[in-house]
C-alpha cells in the first residue's frame, strides 16, 4: 500500500464531516491525486464525499489550480484569446457546437485556443470530430501556438497536457457517476485564457462556476446553460452568468435577443463522428440548415461580446457571414495541413 501524507487524511476527514475545504486544502488534495499519491479507495471516498456535500467554488478553483500547476506547459501569448467549451454530459447528443463555433469565431477575427477531449455523453466529443477532419490531436505546444498566431485557432487535447488525470480514471470509470472532474475540464485549459465562454450541463452550476472563475482570476467570461444544453440555446431560454472585472451579472437570453427565431432541439441533433463531420462541413461552408447555422452563430455571438462587441444581433450576422463565405472551413483545412 502506498504511504500517504497525513494531511490528506485530515482533508478527507473534513469532507466526511460535510465541511467545505478551503481553496488551499483542495489544491493540496488534488495535487496529491494528480501525482498519483492518493490510494484509489481513498480517492473514491473523497470524490464521493465531495459530490454528496456539493462542490463549492473554492474547492473547484483549488482543484483546477492544482491541475494547471501540474500540466505540461503551453507558450501562452500576450494578446487576448479565449476558450469556448462545454462540460459535456448534457445527454442531448447535439452537433459539436462549441468546436464549430471556435472556427467561426476565428474567422470573425478573434483568437481561440480550444481545450477539449473525447466525448463523455455524446457519441462525438470535440476531439472525435477534429480527428475526422485530419487535425493532429498530438500537435506540439509550439505548433499549436503557431496556429493560434497565424490562423487564430488552435486545439489543445487534454490528455497531451494533463497526463496526471489518468490516476483518477479507474476510480471515475468504476463510480460511473459525475464527479468534480466533470466540471474541471473547461477550467484547466493549459493556455490559461483570460476570456472564456463555458457551458454547463445543469443550470444549478451556472452561478457556482462563475464564482469559481472569479476565484481563478478570469478577466471576462460567461457561464451558460441553455434549456438542458451546455450551450447557448436556440430552442429556448439561456441562463447566463457573465463576469466583468470580478463582478458577476446574471441574465437570460432568448433566440430573439440574437435576432433569430426559435427552433426545435431535434433540428440540431448530432450523430457518430463521421455523420457529424458531414454536418459540420455543411455548416462551415454555408450549406447548413437555418437551425444548425443559428445554433453555432448564437454561441459565437456571445463569445464576441466577451471581446467587447456588445451587439448580439450584429455579432450573430457576422458569424453567419463567416459560415456562408466558407472562411471558417478554410481554417479547418489549414489547421489540418499543419500536421
Curated annotation (Swiss-Prot):
Record field: catalytic activity: N-(5-phospho-beta-D-ribosyl)anthranilate + diphosphate = 5-phospho-alpha-D-ribose 1-diphosphate + anthranilate
The protein's annotated pathway: Amino-acid biosynthesis; L-tryptophan biosynthesis; L-tryptophan from chorismate: step 2/5
Binding-site residues, 5-phospho-alpha-D-ribose 1-diphosphate: 86, 89-90, 94, 96-99, 114-122, 126
Entry note: cofactor: Binds 2 magnesium ions per monomer.
Pfam families assigned: Glycos_trans_3N (PF02885), Glycos_transf_3 (PF00591)
Record-linked InterPro entries: Anthranilate_Pribosyl_Tfrase (IPR005940), Glycosyl_Trfase_fam3 (IPR000312), Glycosyl_Trfase_fam3_N_dom (IPR017459), Glycosyl_Trfase_fam3_N_dom_sf (IPR036320), Nuc_phospho_transferase (IPR035902)
One biological process term in Gene Ontology: L-tryptophan biosynthetic process
Binding residue positions for Mg(2+) 2: 230-231
Entry binding sites for Mg(2+) 1: 98, 231
Entry GO CC: cytosol
EC primary class: transferase
Source species, domain of life: Bacteria
Assigned EC number: 2.4.2.18
Gene Ontology molecular function: anthranilate phosphoribosyltransferase activity; magnesium ion binding
Cofactor(s) essential for the protein: Mg(2+)
Binding site for anthranilate 1: 86, 117
Binding site residues for anthranilate 2: 172
Keywords, in A-Z order: Amino-acid biosynthesis, Aromatic amino acid biosynthesis, Glycosyltransferase, Magnesium, Metal-binding, Transferase, Tryptophan biosynthesis
Keyword Ribosomal protein: no
PANTHER family tied to this protein: ANTHRANILATE PHOSPHORIBOSYLTRANSFERASE
Function: Catalyzes the transfer of the phosphoribosyl group of 5-phosphorylribose-1-pyrophosphate (PRPP) to anthranilate to yield N-(5'-phosphoribosyl)-anthranilate (PRA).
Quaternary structure (record): Homodimer.
Family: Belongs to the anthranilate phosphoribosyltransferase family.
Protein name: Anthranilate phosphoribosyltransferase
Lineage: Bacteria, Pseudomonadati, Pseudomonadota, Gammaproteobacteria, Vibrionales
Name of the gene this protein is made from: trpD
Amino acid at each position: 500500500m502506498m504511504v500517504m501524507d497525513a494531511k490528506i487524511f485530515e482533508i478527507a476527514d473534513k469532507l466526511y464531516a460535510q465541511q467545505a475545504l478551503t481553496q488551499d486544502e483542495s489544491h493540496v488534495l488534488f495535487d496529491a491525486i494528480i501525482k498519483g499519491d492518493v490510494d484509489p479507495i481513498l480517492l473514491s471516498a473523497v470524490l464521493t464525499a465531495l459530490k454528496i456535500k456539493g462542490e463549492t467554488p473554492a474547492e473547484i478553483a483549488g482543484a483546477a489550480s492544482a491541475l494547471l500547476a501540474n500540466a505540461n506547459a503551453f507558450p501562452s501569448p500576450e494578446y487576448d484569446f479565449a476558450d469556448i467549451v462545454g462540460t459535456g454530459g448534457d445527454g442531448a447528443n447535439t452537433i459539436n457546437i462549441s468546436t464549430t463555433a471556435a472556427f467561426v469565431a476565428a474567422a470573425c477575427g478573434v483568437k481561440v485556443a480550444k481545450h477539449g477531449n473525447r466525448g463523455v455523453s455524446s457519441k462525438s466529443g470535440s476531439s472525435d470530430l477534429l480527428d475526422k477532419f485530419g487535425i493532429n490531436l498530438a500537435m506540439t505546444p509550439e505548433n499549436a501556438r503557431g496556429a493560434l498566431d497565424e490562423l487564430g485557432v488552435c486545439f489543445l487535447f487534454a490528455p497531451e497536457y494533463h497526463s496526471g488525470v489518468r490516476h483518477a480514471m479507474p476510480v471515475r470509470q468504476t463510480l460511473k457517476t459525475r464527479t468534480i472532474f466533470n466540471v474541471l475540464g473547461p477550467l484547466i485549459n493549459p493556455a490559461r485564457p483570460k476570456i472564456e465562454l463555458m457551458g454547463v450541463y445543469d443550470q444549478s452550476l451556472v452561478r457556482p462556476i462563475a464564482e469559481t472563475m472569479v476565484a481563478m482570476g478570469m478577466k471576462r467570461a460567461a457561464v451558460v446553460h441553455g434549456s438542458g444544453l451546455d450551450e447557448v440555446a436556440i430552442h429556448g431560454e439561456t441562463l447566463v452568468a457573465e463576469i466583468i472585472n470580478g463582478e458577476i451579472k446574471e441574465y437570460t437570453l432568448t433566440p430573439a435577443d440574437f435576432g433569430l427565431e426559435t427552433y426545435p432541439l431535434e433540428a440540431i441533433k448530432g450523430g457518430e463522428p463521421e455523420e457529424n463531420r458531414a454536418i459540420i462541413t455543411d455548416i462551415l461552408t454555408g450549406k447548413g440548415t437555418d437551425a444548425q447555422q443559428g445554433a453555432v452563430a448564437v454561441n459565437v455571438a456571445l463569445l464576441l461580446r466577451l471581446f467587447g462587441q456588445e451587439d448580439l444581433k450584429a455579432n450573430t450576422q457576422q458569424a453567419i457571414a463567416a459560415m456562408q463565405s466558407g472562411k471558417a472551413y478554410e481554417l479547418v483545412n489549414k489547421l489540418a495541413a499543419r500536421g
